[in-house]
Amino acid sequence: MGKIVKAVKKIINLTPGIKEASVSVYHKYSQLRYRKYVKKYPIDAHTVVFESYMGRKYSCSPRAMFEAMCEDSRYRDYKKVWAFTDPEKHRYLEKYPNTILVKYRSEDYYRYYARAGMWITNYLLDYGIEKRPGQIYVQTWHGTPLKKIGCDVPRLELSKKERERTCREYQREGQMIDFMPSPSPFYTEKVKSAFCLGPQARILEFGYPRNDDLFRYTEEKCENIKKELGIPADKKVILYAPTWRQSQHTAGEGFTYSLGIDFDKMKTRLGDKAVILFRTHYFISNSFDFSKYGGFIKDVSSYDEINDLYLISDLLITDYSSVFFDYANLERPILFYMYDYEAYREEMKDFYFGIELLPGPVIKEERDISEDVERLLEGFAVDDTYRRFNEIFNPHREVCGDRMVREIIREYR
């Protein structure tokens, strides 16, 4: 059955006009599923729906705010509903009182969205869902952007039809959002324009709940994470987290990723002293076989909470992913391996700022980087560029999820 569904999706994506028509039909179908529950149920102010990365993970700011609510007596009697593509994987969350798990885009999913007094998500809502008067929408997004997003994307990057669709999706979102957390004035400015935020939206600019774990971890927690992942205590940990490429897309399958890093050379130089954690973007559909490297490379792409990976890593290697904004809170070394920089700039057209602001060395050609990695592991110090970066992008470096939920109560309850 899975192969048949995959084949049908591929045909749809490869046939001009059919993809757009199928998306339109799906949107209408989703709206019908949602609206029947709107007609049937009143809003329950004491129900909150949480969703992270379209149901893929228990992570990011929705997780931080959920855990803050669980610790806040004012939310004790609230029903807390999590939407997951695989609810069985997350049954452990039912240990929290009044916590319910539903399958992403199931009937229960639309029913709880229609009834809930509050939604907390980090991605665009399912197109069938429309906010009712009296509901509260907290859109946390999923990181500070380097690449332009939403209505800020340059006209040259997308076709007219694609740009209109993108702007429509973000504008629709922006007219429903009531609250957005913000880690910086830079972030506030960009989400206002990218989402064309309406007058009802309030930006809470005192930190990013998704980073809470980075300010309250213990050595014991780090040791436990390493044990869980099978990482020897005496090895340095390198987190490699590249982003997706628009040009690496297979119709009917999704985005793929072609490795631009020479792991063979890295193992030769670093194999006896380090472990690499490989983390792809959640858009990436292809898998990787690192078995020939033994325990030197561990694929942690399916690991829910990236903060755990930040905490145990001695160095981050990335490219254009927003992970470096979060990781910089730890003031640890970052290497920007932008081996396809010129092609990527041509493809994406524009970033929100120049690479001269980045808090680490930038490599703009494909080559062996093991020596650069070794140098950073052995002799790193926070410099003026790194400090300036955090002043601009991470001025509020403290736990804020609990304050966020208090502000929402104060404003609306």
Regions found by a protein language model. Give the residues of each.
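Conserved catalytic-core segment of nucleotide-activated headgroup transferases in glycan assembly
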Residues: S59-E67, P209-S291, I363-E365, C400
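A short beta-strand/loop micro-motif in the catalytic core of glycosyltransferases
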Residues: W119-I120, D178-S184, I276-L277, L316-I317
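Extended catalytic core of nucleotide-activated donor transferases of GT-like folds
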Residues: R63-E67, N98-E162, R168
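Donor nucleotide-activated moiety binding/catalytic core segment of transferases
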Residues: L101-G117, L277, Y282-F325
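Catalytic binding pocket for nucleotide-activated donors in carbohydrate/polymer assembly enzymes
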Residues: S291-G295, S322-F393
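N-terminal pre-catalytic "stem/leader" segment of glycosyltransferase-like enzymes
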Residues: G2-E107
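A donor-sugar binding/catalytic signature common to diverse glycosyltransferases
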Residues: M118-K148, Y303-M348
